[in-house]
Structures are given as structure tokens and as C-alpha cells.
């Protein structure tokens, strides 16, 4: 249970965010939209990433191109976040439940990729690449 608690907590948080009043409120007002967006990307996604990574065998966490992954994930996050905040896509997500679901799924996917990059490796190189991904995304 100690290995999977972040995964379970992330799932419960997603359920609270997506099944509560926020999705409907987010269609009409900016503040609930941002609470939902940040709750998915900055609270649920890191918990899910930590929980999922804990389930991987240790040898899977040793390889990879940390810097290339960090740059690619940062670019992906940038495109997804800013793309959905462009007026046409933002309005489409507010008007259509399907588009809203796609928006939320893409926010979660980008968040998982970003936090997975930050937490994935065991080396200092991976930690530095993860920190770089976070820094680039926050700009």
C-alpha cells in the first residue's frame, strides 16, 4: 500500500475534480477553469506519475536521454497548454462536453509526461533534466 498511495490519491483527486461542480463552473468562469486546470496538472498529475513510477521495475528507470526528454516534454506541454488557451479552442472546450473531455485528457497527459520526466530517473542527470523541464514549462 505504501508504494501505491500516490497513485490512489491522484485518482481520487481526479475524481473529485472531474466529477464535482468544477467542470460545469469552468464553462462559465475563468477562476474555476484555472482551479481545475492547475488541480489536474500540478496536483493530480504528479501524484499519478510518482505512483506509476513506483510500480516500474528499478532497471527501467536507469536509461534514457534525460535532456532530450525534458526538452521534448516541455515543448509538448507548451503546445498543449497554450493551444487550449487560444480563443477558438478555449471556447470549443467550454461549449462542447467532448472537447472539454479532450482538453482535460490532454492537460493530464502533458502533466503526466512533465512530472514523469521530473521524477523518472535516479541519477543527478535525470533530476537536473526534470528540473529543467519544470523551469521551461513555468516560463
Which positions does each model-derived feature cover?
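Alpha-helical membrane segments of multi-pass proteins
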Residues: 1-139
